[in-house]
Amino acid sequence: PVNLLTGSFSWNYTDLSLYGRHDLPFTRYYESTAFEQDHHFGNGFTTNYSYELNVDLLYADFFMPHNRHVYFSMMPDGSYRAKAGSAFSLDVTDTSYVIRHRDGTTYIFDRNDNSVSQKIRSISSLDGEQIVYAYNGDLISSVTGDAGTLTFTYSGEHVTRVTDSTGRSITLSYDGELLTAVENPDGDS
């Protein structure tokens, strides 16, 4: 759909889903206003696993799927605070950054003081759902939940294949920074 106020085009599609007590889908999101941003799936695309936390001396930027951001300002005591009315809070421990939503969802990021970008390690909810991230260097290699695992294969910085724990996969093709085709498990594009 097109946002009539901004003219932005938004789109999403679920390519794969593992079903269980807590489903593990793989959903792509496109946002035309984020066209110059590439989060490993081509310009303008994110997925339901695209979470980032960038921290510097003055603020923290929590990036979520669909090109959403929550900004936290650093307080004089070293804590972080979002704008008044925000549904999110950010706490810092010796080893992690912990972001909580008022609905009980918790996002845990590694704390690496030598890097602005922090790696997400897990997402959990009050009903017991937990998604755990694994990495190969700085790239997400897999996400695992109750229903199974999704594994990511890369060519350079772009994901070229997503495979679920049943063996089904999708293949993604690129022309430079642009996602040009997605082949589903049945071989259709």
What are these regions (language model features)?
Residues 17-29:
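Predominantly extracellular/luminal regions of secreted and cell-surface proteins
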Residues 1, 19-21, 140:
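Compositionally biased, low-complexity segments of secreted and virulence-associated proteins
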Residues 1-11:
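Boundary/junction segments of secreted and surface-exposed precursor proteins
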Residues 9-19:
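Short aromatic-glycine motifs in intrinsically disordered, low-complexity regions
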